[in-house]
Amino acid sequence: MSKGLLISIEGPDGAGKTSVLKVLLPRLREVYPAQVITTREPGGVAIAEQIREVILDIDNTAMDAKTELLLYIAARRQHLVEKVLPELENGNMVIMDRFIDSSVAYQGAGRGLDQDEVAWLNNYATDGHKPDLTLLFDVDSETGLARIAANGEREVNRLDLEKLDMHQRVRQGYLDLAEAEPERIKRIDASQTLEEVVEDTWEIIKSYL
């Protein structure tokens, strides 16, 4: 697919994936022969960041599930062609904070949209590109939401306002994806201490370098 290495990090809200990435980045940059680029979805480039603001705005409570999905898909396409693919072509490692699996878990399992249709839209938007490795940071929904509530630095967004059962469906959607694609998606127990999660993650990534 490309000269570089594409890694996505996924998980339900409050799993701590961003904290793990911050700790691991210095290690990765020491051992990877090219640049290590981090980016996020939705966002990463100007157009996609503008779409992100619309999606996450807490005032947009009237947003329909399909509208939400299509906004994510539009942001994904722009981000991929403008930033991700050029970096991969240059031989760099790209680490994406969320990618295609988020749509299946959140809009598919969480919102109840047809998961085959979500997968088709993902494929259409990405021309079939998938991560070489997906790290799934898994934590039960109650723990994840408690972490969000305790994090005073994190700005609350529209998705944080969803009820517990929505978050539980999202988590199950992720677990189903991991079961369906075990070679690509590696589950990490994110209920452990940060140090333990970091080491588990590092062992997985090392096998792909």
UniProtKB/Swiss-Prot annotation:
GO terms for biological process: dTDP biosynthetic process; dTTP biosynthetic process; dUDP biosynthetic process. GO terms for cellular component: cytosol. One of its GO terms (molecular function) is dTMP kinase activity. It catalyses: dTMP + ATP = dTDP + ADP. Signal peptide: none annotated. Keywords: ATP-binding, Kinase, Nucleotide biosynthesis, Nucleotide-binding, Transferase. Disulfide bonds: none annotated. Gene3D superfamilies: P-loop containing nucleotide triphosphate hydrolases. ATP binds at G11, P12, D13, G14, A15, G16, K17, T18. It is an enzyme of class 2 (transferase). Its EC number is 2.7.4.9. It comes from the Bacteria. It holds the Pfam family Thymidylate_kin. CDD domains: TMPK (cd01672). Phosphorylation of dTMP to form dTDP in both de novo and salvage pathways of dTTP synthesis. Belongs to the thymidylate kinase family. PANTHER family: THYMIDYLATE KINASE, UMP-CMP KINASE 2, MITOCHONDRIAL. This is Thymidylate kinase. It comes from Streptococcus thermophilus (strain ATCC BAA-250 / LMG 18311).
